């Protein structure tokens, strides 16, 4: 069975601004990597996979401002989005009646209002704090959680509220 634990962070809390800034930086990385992939794809160089994109983006400012594991997760999400696009195009060519229109490439996030998900794997979290039942994402943002086998954690933005999500397995 899979369990999830949610905490709601409203825009009035001090933690909200820190998370919002990181999500904005996450969006910048997503858009920068998406631009590189789109240019490569459009101009005939082919698709750039996750490993190549990770190598290319390591020197990019948007990659450096986030923890490395978080940056890698963002690039993995983008890679998954592009692979889904290619699968949808294949399915569209086989039977276009299942679609309302031709599948579109992954879009850019909005330049000003856009935010992107922050995914913290178990490797990106302090193991000393984790043993105490505390998840310390970054300075001044800590959460106590229900003990269990923790898989992934992340922040998801929903209408001016940030929600930390924890996935626990085994209970």
Could you say what each language-model-derived stretch is?
Residues 1-171:
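Nucleic-acid substrate recognition interfaces
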